[in-house]
């Protein structure tokens, strides 16, 4: 009997990118990546990261792909912080159309409540920082939808398993030393 080895994935054609510009979207997932090692200006840090994902109204046109006809899903990674300079805070305030009150900041904001919330996304094609030959559709702005827009409903179930690449990122999380110490007490 033959034992055949194949290259099972690297020959797949990349999906076409969604159109750049402004598009209607709905939040379809919030993934907690846990504590991740990051590097900024040569300094290594450990920060709690999350990913917010949206389905956009544009569908994938790639007949050879298993995703043909499905909505594009875009995402953005954030540090889990509502600090004054935090990108998460800036984007949430833009999406909500209003700043957080001091009481909201003190009480915190439950990101899981974003599932199913509509918005407009600014989408820009940008080269990868490491490999400029790779181009991605990045979320550059999040705005509240205009009044009267027909709301989108996520096709992705709230409790659906994250994609493989997200699971791999979660697996890279640094163990929370403080939580382990509290469990040991």
Where are these regions (language model features)?
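Short beta-rich binding modules
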Residues: 1-185
């Amino acid at each position: 009997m033959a034992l055949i080895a194949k290259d099972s994935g690297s020959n797949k054609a990349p999906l076409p990118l969604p159109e750049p510009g402004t598009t209607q979207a709905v939040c379809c997932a919030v993934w907690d990546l846990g504590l991740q090692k990051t590097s900024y200006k040569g300094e290594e840090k450990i920060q709690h990261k999350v990913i917010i994902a949206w389905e956009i109204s544009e569908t994938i046109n790639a007949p050879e792909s298993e995703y043909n006809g499905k909505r594009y899903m875009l995402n953005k990674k954030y540090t889990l912080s509502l600090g004054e300079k935090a990108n998460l805070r800036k984007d949430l305030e833009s999406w909500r159309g209003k700043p957080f009150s001091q009481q909201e900041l003190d009480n915190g904001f439950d990101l899981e409540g974003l599932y199913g919330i509509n918005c407009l996304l600014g989408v820009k094609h940008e080269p990868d920082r490491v490999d400029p030959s790779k181009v991605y559709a990045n979320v550059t702005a999040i705005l509240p939808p205009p009044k009267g827009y027909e709301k989108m409903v996520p096709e992705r179930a709230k409790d659906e398993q994250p994609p493989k690449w997200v699971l791999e990122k979660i697996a890279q999380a640094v163990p929370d030393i403080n939580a382990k110490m509290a469990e040991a007490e």
